[in-house]
A protein has these predicted regions:
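Enriched but not universal
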Residues: 1-18, 334-341
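Short coil/turn segments that connect the beta-strands within blades of beta-propeller domains
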Residues: 16-17, 61-63, 107-109, 153-155, ...
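Short loop/turn segments immediately following the C-termini of beta-strands
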Residues: 24, 70, 116, 162, ...
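Beta-strand initiation motifs
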Residues: 36-44, 82-90, 128-136, 174-182, ...
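Surface loop/turn motifs at the tips and blade-to-blade linkers of beta-strand repeat domains
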Residues: 46-50, 92-96, 138-142, 183-187, ...
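Blade-level signature of beta-propeller repeat domains, shared across WD40, Kelch, NHL, RCC1
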Residues: 306-308, 325-341
Length: 341
């Protein structure tokens, strides 16, 4: 029975910001209230994802949370009200192979999943349940889809993938348009992450092989690649996030210091000094800022699996770990209200 007190508690909980992370050991997803510090871990969903968690995102309205994972159905979505609701029924046509990452359109009316097997991307209408899978693009991405994002206007969808050209972008009107011409200078290796600036005027790709991050002006087509930062990320670029104001870009990567942040004004500024306490002791795999831009979170291998720092244009002192840690290597991280572009 829901009492007046418990109902009020649920409403307060639902209104709080939350931080969510995926990991490679059951329950594969961990969510915590966020108030500038970690709250008590939210109870696991009744039906867990079926394998290692990879990507994670909330709907733009924050009323559902989606998890990409290994093993069919490859994507699991739950109503969200500060706690997990009953898992939404799987789509009639599942993504082909392990789900890697997913994104919702800015309007929240479609969900896109990057996945392991051809066609490497699957998009579904979203109304709180999955609609019929949208027809594949005429020109498929050339390899495993690893990350996905929409422009802020929702007019284009981008897929980071293995195999040249490593990035594929399509006009989006509820169906796929003709693939946009490749950039003149391709990313230098398999792509792992993609993000648009909040203003939508640049697209950033994290990838294997130096320089490990490539950024291009974006006007519906790729512009000339922006000059590399003076100090490159030290290892394979995995995930990318811009601050909500668009004035900094963060790259999670392999090799110490595992996170690199740069001022962004359409070109790279001087790399921000590393945090005093680095995230974990091996690969940074996911990165996100709070919607207000006052904290930055990194999902990483090795305990504590997630590290969060105050952010004021520089790293503050690492925030205390949650009382209940994620149970395995952190794969991705997001905040409720953080827009994955």
């Amino acid at each position: 029975m829901i009492t007046a007190t418990s109902s009020l508690s649920q409403n307060v909980q639902a209104g709080l910001p939350h931080i969510a992370t995926t990991h490679d050991t059951t329950p594969f997803i961990s969510v915590y209230p966020w108030t500038g510090a970690f709250g008590t871990k939210v109870a696991d969903p009744a039906t867990l994802p079926t394998g290692d968690g990879s990507g994670i995102n909330f709907t733009p309205s924050g009323d559902h949370i989606a998890v990409g994972h290994r093993i069919a159905p490859s994507i699991s979505v739950y109503p969200w009200s500060g706690t997990f609701g009953a898992k939404v029924a799987d789509p009639a046509t599942l993504p082909a192979g392990d789900g890697r990452d997913m994104a919702f359109t800015p309007s929240g009316d479609h969900i896109a999943v990057a996945h392991f097997d051809t066609p490497f991307i699957s998009v579904y209408p979203w109304t709180g349940t999955f609609g019929t899978k949208v027809a594949n693009p005429a020109t498929l991405p050339t390899g495993i889809g690893r990350d996905i994002g929409f422009t802020p206007s929702g007019g284009h969808i981008a897929v980071a993938h293995v195999t040249t050209p490593f990035i594929s972008v399509y006009p989006w009107t509820g169906t796929f348009g003709t693939k946009v011409a490749n950039p003149a200078t391709l990313p230098a290796g398999d792509s792992n992450g993609v993000a648009f600036t909040p203003s939508g005027d640049s697209i950033a790709i994290g990838h294997a092989t130096s320089p490990r991050i490539s950024i291009y002006p974006w006007t519906g087509t790729f512009g000339t690649k922006v000059a590399n930062p003076a100090t490159l990320p030290a290892g394979t670029g995995r995930d990318i996030a811009f601050t909500p104001s668009g004035d900094h870009i963060a790259v999670a990567h392999t090799t110490t210091p595992f996170i690199s942040v740069y001022p962004w004004t359409g070109t790279f500024g001087t790399k921000v000094a590393n945090p005093a306490t680095l995230p974990g002791s091996t690969s940074g795999l996911g990165v996100a800022f709070t919607p207000s831009g006052d904290s930055i979170a990194i999902a990483h291998e090795v305990t504590p699996f997630i590290s969060v720092y105050p952010w004021t244009g520089t790293f503050g002192t690492k925030i205390s770990n949650p009382a209940t840690l994620p149970t395995g290597d952190g794969k991705d991280v997001t905040f409720k209200g953080f827009t994955k572009l």
